[in-house]
Amino acid sequence: MIKSITVEEQVVDLKEPFITSLRHLHSYPIVQVVIELESGEIGIGQCVATPQIVGDTHQEILNDLNSELVQGLKEISAEDILELPILPSSRAALDMALWFIGSHAQRAVKTDVTIPISNLYDLRQIVRSRVDAGFQHFKLKVNQGSIGELLQRIDLIREVAGDNTPIRIDPNQAWSLEFAVDASRELEKSGAFIEYLEQPLSRSNLSGHKSLSQEIVIPLMADESCFSARELEGIVESQAFKYLNVKILKSGGIFPALSLIKEAQDAGLNISIGSMMEGEVGIRAAIYLAAETAPDAIHDLDAAWWFKKSEITYAEGMVYS
């Protein structure tokens, strides 16, 4: 039985700016929900608003979790949470709190590290800091600039990190189809190891992604195009993608994420677990999800490395919860 559900606000401070085509973060608020059971057990869940991605706001999440519907809950299961008429991020925080009550084993998986959008002058030091920290796979955030500058960035990463360093390119929906085709062809000529191109076009443009996949060799990853099993059907039918990035907040919790991953893997997609930078508890939950579903994959779980304060450990390209 649930004794109380407490909603708290916290601020996450980053040690350096996190810059993508969608977000520019130095610090940001997160919402933490604490479920206390009559037995004395406590579960903690976290979420963050991402208006540019999920379409929610911080205040909407607070309203959800402080609502009479949620505050009046006395018994709840992961299946029950799916039926709550609240935002996916709000559901995810509640789902995460239930997971927290029963799971504290340490897990470890391989992860990449993000290289944010920056000027070329700063890029060298940014890459060097990540190499010195032991990371071996790099996710390069980009917007639609010039192809020449994109190639310069790739060359610089290879120069600092090694010629055959695996690089993932993530435009976060910022590219046009024409630019994506032209840029990918030049990248293929460069000899760089481009592991995949993540969500280059807008999330609704599955036909464009299919056309792109037929024009280039570099595999595509779906991220913003797939939040749930309903959208997965379109992803699979498009035959455009080889990879799928799954995030707990997008899916609405660990329980629905597990279901989505099973369906995606059955359809032949390779899974990578990511996060919305929703706080340390959220990253621990994502590490658990990654270890349970794709233990040998290189995931996208560097978020806690950006935090000024964190007890999550990173070493030699691994993240330890």
Residue spans for each PLM region:
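Active-site lining segments that contact anionic ligands and/or coordinate catalytic metals
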Residues: 30, 241, 268, 296-298
